[in-house]
Amino acid sequence: MHHIGMTQWIVGDEPLETSCRRLQACGYDGIEFAAEPDQLDADECLALMKRYDLNCRSLCGIFNEERDLTASGEKGEAAVLYLKKSVDFAEKVGAKIIIVVPSPVGRTVKPKELSMEELKENAVRNIRKAADYAWSKGISLALEAINRYETYFANTMTKVYELAQRIDHPGVGVMADLFHMSIEEANIPSSLYMVRDRLLHVHIADNTREAAGMGHTDFASALRMLDNIGYQGSLTMEFMYRLADPYSASEISTQTGLMDHYAKQAIDFIRMTERSLLAAE
C-alpha cells in the first residue's frame, strides 16, 4: 500500500486545521502543502501535523507569471529565489520533494520574442540553480508536465523527461499527474514506464479532475505499472472543482461538504484498487 496524501492548495480559503482534521478522519497519511512560504507558517503546519498524525513529503509549487522559470534576467532570478525560499520552508516541515512547473500555468502561447530553444535554455539554467540549493539540503525538484490547455511548454511526459535529462542534475526528476496524463498521453502505463528512472512523485485525479473513481481513468493499470517499476513514493490527491483556471481554486470559498466527499471518495477508491491488485497476485 502506498503512502497517500492530499495537496492543500486546492481547498481555497479553508482553515488549515479543517483540512488536517478531514485528512485524519478519512485515513490519509500526509498533507502536501502549497509552496507558499510567505503565506504559511511552518510552526503552525508542524503543530497541526502532530495533532492530526500527518506528515509532509512534498510541496506543490505554484507557478504564475511572476515565477517563470523559462524567463531570463531578473524575472528568471525571481523564480529561482521563489524556489529557494520554498526549499527553506520544505526543510522546516520535513518535505523532501518540491513540484516544479517550468512555465507559468495559464500562459498557453509561447512568448514571441524568444525561440523555444531559448526558453528551454533559460529553464535548464534556472532549474539547475535552484536544484543546486535544494540538493544541498537533501531536497529534490520534480518537474511536472501540464496539459496544453493550461500552458504551452513541456506538456507531455516525454517533454518533461527530456528536460530533466538535459538539466542532468541528481536532484531533479519528474512527477506524473494522472489528470494531465489523461489528456496528453496515449497510454498512461507506458508513459510511467518510460520515466521510471526519474519518477519522484504522483498526483491523482480522474479525467474530469474530480476525485479518483468519478471519471473513466484506468487507475488499476496505472497502479499496476507503478508497482511493476518499483515506485515507492507517495500518491497525492489533487482533485478540484471543474475550473478553467486551476489556480483560481486557491481563491474561492471552499465548499467543505464537497471537499469532504471528494477526499473520502478518492482514498476509498485508490485503497480499493490497491487491495484488488494485491488479491489478484
Task: Go through each PLM region and give its residues.
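Histidine-acidic metal/acid-base catalytic patches
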Residues: 1-4, 10-24, 94-95, 158-172, ...
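Conserved, mostly hydrophobic/aromatic
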Residues: 23, 31, 49, 79, ...
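Catalytic-core regions built around general acid/base machinery
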Residues: 44-53, 126-134, 191, 221-226
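Structural motif corresponding to the early beta-alpha repeats
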Residues: 29, 35-124, 232, 236-246, ...
